[in-house]
Regions:
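C-terminal beta-signal and adjacent terminal beta-strands/loops
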Residues: 630-633, 691-699, 718-780
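Short, acidic, small-residue-rich periplasmic hinge/interaction motif at the N-terminus
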Residues: 28, 39-43, 71-75, 85-134
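Gram-negative outer-membrane beta-barrel transporters
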Residues: 491, 595, 612-700
């Protein structure tokens, strides 16, 4: 009898053991980022687990087959059939569409801009994110308007469509698209940025980031993330009409082609007569394919084409304190109607990602773009107060930049332990080849106007003909090797160490007649940049105190093409400390202080010089909060004291010691409040924002200034249950007259000394007056 009982027990135990099935897997979002703290449950039982920091899980299910459910905050629930024949599963969860506080305050989002896939709360650096919900609420579809929402970032737009950014007192920055560098800004500082028709979010990383992204990243990084394919069919369409006879159409759709292949297609078309008659036309289209043959491998292909036209705006002549001449209406566009900036860009990249069983990843990126900037403009205005006339005595300036960079990047990420220390590490290599040609032309037909009445100007008639006569070439090869190590000493105490070695090799041919022989010059640099940071969480998952130090390097190319002066590379360091607060996607606060030192500072534009050191110190506050249910607020403040160090001026030169750096407001402030009723009038929303920018100097001599200004903007919208949204946005509600951009004495000059008395030395651009945008959109 005992033997029978034992035998029966053994059989039952065997059956119980046999019925247990071990399932392992990973959970990622649609961008391939691991999702921690996902609840994994087996339906019909109490069996459950959660994913770890790498999105991995192991669960023993009490039967041969069944269904697992996956749930996480800010993601749609997901169900997956599993069994003995599927011991390993790879799950992709789609981000949920919730009310504004959950969407806007994305505290748990792991940021692409920090490379190590670290949560924002943990990252010992200042990062600001404008996600799709924010862009939609404020109807933002360009980088200039997006940058105004971030403390410490001052966007500057000159010569029609050339965009650059002053970040923490300096205009050295790097623009990334999906983590891939746009080298145009590092060569000539400014370049057009395409519309946001296919943009998912924008990440701003402030301060030097040479260890992660290579040369020229002193002020910071701007990473523009495009929309990705999804596992379910999703799409949206948006139509906007507005002031200045503006219309904008955007459409996008994505989803599965098969179980392993997904797509995303986006397109946008914008046309406007523009404020002051400054016309603009943008066309943007893109395709992304994502292929996942199994849970370990992902292949991504992306192609984009944009063709943009920007009308000219040379501004209006002004006094050095930023006031237009009292006999000129600042709202008149004095530029020749035939002047233009055209930008055509074709971009491609291929990405491959492999996930190893031990948790590491291998990433490969290959990218190429072909960009043409065609520019023609009478930049300098000559005016005669007696006759109230305008002339363009210099004639138009023309160039065509053709930029073709090829970039290759390899990253290997992995984790390991040394004694009690946990490491998350990345090592990588980048290689880039840049080919750039600049063609200059002479206008042989369609001369510039002279003695044009300013009251009722006729600003250009007929076509212009440009004959290419000169060329300048640039070829650069940059090879970089880098590492970062995220070390966890304890659950609340972590250290980030990073370093990068760059080898820079450039060959340059000065501007010459296209019939002349090249005169090549060579420049070679070796440089090491670093980052060291500490992160401590006194209150776990709520508060982080951090401190960091990082460095910067920028090749200045061999000389100034206008004067022939040879310049040294610019270098710099930053020290930063701050506090971050986050709570369940209801609160996201960063308070940071910084000190930056820059060596071999370059100043000027028309005539450039290298003057030694410059410094920037300040603090910033960025806060997002849901004050109560339905009321969301975003506040940003930046204090930036950036100045040039002690100088020994050359004979005849102005002493600029301790002068403020150009384009740097000492104080800037923005605040936006958005309210959505939760019961009565549910679906309606209203928002109000205020933006303040302090006065800014436009030259290193501090002799030309744009006054401070304050703007009030607003929005009202209705979100219907059928996914239709109608919104009205009003910019500059109080119809304030203000000036936000300018051409200074650094940019303006006279070809003939006899004309100098009539030449404008300061041409300012007024910002848009009160204007409206009405948008209707549909998503599915």
């Amino acid at each position: 009898m005992v033997r029978k009982i034992l035998s029966t027990g053994f059989v039952l135990a065997s059956i119980g053991l046999y019925s247990q099935t071990v399932i392992t897997g990973e959970v990622h979002d649609t961008s391939g980022n691991a999702i921690p703290n996902v609840k994994v449950s087996f339906e019909g039982s109490a069996t459950e687990t959660v994913t770890d920091g790498n999105g991995k899980f192991i669960i023993n299910i009490p039967s041969q087959k069944g269904t697992l459910t996956f749930s996480a905050e800010n993601f749609h629930p997901f169900r997956r059939s599993v069994g003995a024949n599927t011991p390993v599963v790879y799950v992709v969860m789609k981000e949920g569409s919730k009310e504004i506080p959950e969407v806007v305050i994305s505290t748990q989002k792991k940021l692409e801009v920090n490379k190590l896939n670290i949560k924002n709360l943990d990252a010992p650096m200042t990062v600001n994110v404008l996600n799709r919900a924010v862009l939609q609420k404020w109807d933002i579809n360009n980088i200039e308007d997006a940058s105004k929402m971030v403390a410490g970032v001052n966007p500057v737009k000159q010569f029609a469509g050339f965009q650059f950014f002053n970040i923490r007192g300096f205009d050295n920055f790097v623009v990334l698209y999906d983590g891939i560098r746009d080298e145009r800004h590092t060569i000539t500082q400014s370049a057009p940025v395409a519309s946001f028709a296919n943009v998912e979010r924008v990440e701003f990383l402030k301060g030097p980031s040479g260890d992660m992204f290579g040369h020229s990243a002193l002020g910071g990084i701007i990473n523009i993330i495009r929309k990705k394919p999804t596992y379910t069919t999703q799409g949206e369409a948006k139509f906007t009409i507005g002031s200045y006879n503006t219309y904008n159409v955007e459409m996008g759709v994505g989803g599965p082609i098969s179980n392993k292949l997904r797509y995303r297609v986006d397109a946008g078309l914008m046309n406007t007569d523009g404020f002051k008659g400054i016309k603009e036309k943008n066309f943007n289209s893109s395709l992304m394919l994502q292929y996942t043959p199994d849970h370990q491998n992902t292949l991504e292909f992306f192609a984009q084409y944009n063709n943009d036209y920007y009308g000219a705006d040379a501004g209006v002549p002004a006094t050095n304190d930023g006031k237009p001449y009292d006999w000129i209406n600042p709202m008149i566009n004095l530029s020749d109607k035939r002047d233009y900036l055209k930008n055509e860009k074709k971009e491609f990249y291929l990405k491959y990602k492999h996930r190893f069983d031990f948790g590491g990843t291998f990433d490969y990126k290959l990218s190429y773009f072909d960009d043409t900037l065609d520019y023609l403009m009478d930049e300098v205005l000559f005016t005669d107060k007696t006759t109230k006339t305008l002339s363009r005595k210099n004639g138009p300036y023309h160039f065509k930049h053709v930029t073709r960079p090829l970039m290759n990047q390899l990253d290997f990420s992995f984790g390991f332990d040394t004694w009690s220390l946990k490491h998350k590490m990345i090592v990588g290599n980048t290689f880039s080849y840049l080919d750039r040609k600049t063609w200059n032309g002479d206008v042989t037909e369609g001369t510039s106007g002279q003695n044009i009445p300013i009251v009722d100007p006729v600003l250009g008639m007929g076509e212009r003909r440009v004959d290419i006569t000169k060329v300048k070439s640039t070829e650069e090869i940059v090879t970089g090797f880098y590492f970062q190590d995220w070390i966890e000493f304890a659950d609340r105490f972590k250290v980030l160490l990073g370093g990068r070695y760059d080898y820079f090799d450039g060959v340059y041919d000065d501007t010459r007649l296209i019939t002349a022989q090249p005169n090549l010059k060579k420049e070679t640099h070796h440089n090491f940049t670093y980052r060291a940071a500490l992160s401590f969480q006194p209150i776990k998952n709520f508060m982080t105190i951090y401190a960091s130090s990082s460095s910067f390097f920028k090749p200045t190319r061999p000389h100034d093409h206008r004067t022939g002066k040879v310049f040294k590379p610019e270098e710099g360091i930053q020290m930063e400390a701050g506090i971050k607060l986050e709570k369940k996607d209801r609160l996201n606060v960063t308070i940071s202080g910084f000190y930056i030192e820059k060596k071999n500072l370059l100043v000027g534009h028309n005539v450039r010089s290298q003057v030694g050191k410059a410094y920037s110190r300040g603090f910033e506050v960025d806060a997002d909060a849901e004050i109560f249910k339905g009321l969301y607020a975003k506040v940003g403040y930046a204090f930036t004291d950036a100045f040039i160090g002690k100088q020994e001026p050359e004979p005849g030169q102005v002493d600029i010691s301790h002068n403020k750096t150009p384009w740097t407001p000492k104080h800037s402030f923005s605040a936006w409040a958005n309210y959505e009723p939760r019961t009565f009038m549910k679906g309606f929303g209203v928002g109000l924002g205020v933006f303040y920018t302090d006065e800014t100097y436009r030259t290193e001599k501090n002799d030309q200034t744009l006054p401070a200004y304050t703007l009030l903007n607003g929005a009202i919208y209705y979100q219907a249950k059928n996914n239709i949204r109608i919104g009205l946005n009003v910019e500059n509600i109080l119809n304030t007259t203000y000036y936000n951009n300018a051409l200074s004495s650094n940019d303006l000059y006279s070809n003939d000394p006899a004309d100098k008395p009539y030449q404008a030395t300061f041409q300012i651009n007024p910002g848009r007056n009160r204007n409206y945008k009405l948008t209707i959109s549909y998503s599915f």
